[in-house]
């Protein structure tokens, strides 16, 4: 486990689970408890780093799930003001009737097509029903 409140180097966390803390009373893990917007976008400021989060999960259509995730990719930035940025982009969602697999099938297919045409990092990309192809794409892109 990695339980510090800072963005680690890859060598520090290889093979470990990184704990994100969304409970303000706890002082363990990367603190994401303040200002995490439910069903929206968040930017959580820390002294030395910033967490940027897209967590839109209440969707009007399966197409909206991919549209939101794709637009968020275009906002990802690397360090620009002396602070490290850690981006988390959720690729999951529900429709009026929870049909997670239907949303995931569409979003995952669109992500694979999109990623094959992009030369960019994706930050932390959270998927429902992930497959080996998506894993390889994200790992490869983030190591550029």
Predicted regions and their residues:
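Catalytic cores of phosphodiester-bond hydrolases, prominently lipid phosphodiesterases
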Residues: 1-144
């Amino acid at each position: 486990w990695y339980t510090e409140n800072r963005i680690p180097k890859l060598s520090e966390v290889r093979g470990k689970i990184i704990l994100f803390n969304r409970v303000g009373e706890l002082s363990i893990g990367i603190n994401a408890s303040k200002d995490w917007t439910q069903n929206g976008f968040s930017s959580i400021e820390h002294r030395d780093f910033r967490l940027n989060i897209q967590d839109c999960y209440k969707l009007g259509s399966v197409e909206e799930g991919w549209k939101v995730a794709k637009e968020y990719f275009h906002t990802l930035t690397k360090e620009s003001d002396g602070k490290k940025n850690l981006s988390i982009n959720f690729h999951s969602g529900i429709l009026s009737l929870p049909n997670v697999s239907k949303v995931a099938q569409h979003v995952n297919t669109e992500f694979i097509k999109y990623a094959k045409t992009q030369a960019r990092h994706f930050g932390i990309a959270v998927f429902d029903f992930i497959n080996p192809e998506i894993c390889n794409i994200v790992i490869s892109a983030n190591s550029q």
